[in-house]
């Protein structure tokens, strides 16, 4: 129908239906160009119709933060006490500590980390992200809501956020998504975690400089 957003990559069409004729459909793409598609191609090829998203009142965010796995560790007692003072984490810390204490009293033979269950910084961060999104009025609470770990990769441990915004308009949706991830990237160091990223030219230059310095010092000592 007119005005519906459709996506048909095989014809480089991605935008709103601007005209429907007997033998063609004209689509105005987001870059303001037009794509004319023969009507019979809609019977021969698949296409994505975004009308369902627009009418549902929710637009999906599906994006991951890749955590440097070398920074994943158990929480110290001091850190657990500090996180308990976080408004979004107090209930989680209390309930999780009760759960772990009950399990450890029944199953653990000692307080050694190998034999007991303890709070971790990655698990606590995941709980924080969940609580933060639940408290965000721009995130739907009755559509699919997931904060989950995916399989580890060479680029780190993906923590995926799969939620829906309450505003489906493109610019507003992008703003909501950016605000969420701006906050999460900024708060991540509070949990002793770091985002994984591939070494840049500056990183490699620093390593090369350190290597040259060590070689020079070794030569001088010799």
For every predicted segment, state its role.
Residues 2-109:
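Soluble accessory domains appended to multi-pass membrane transport proteins
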Residues 84-222:
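Long, non-transmembrane cytosolic or organellar matrix-exposed soluble domains/tails
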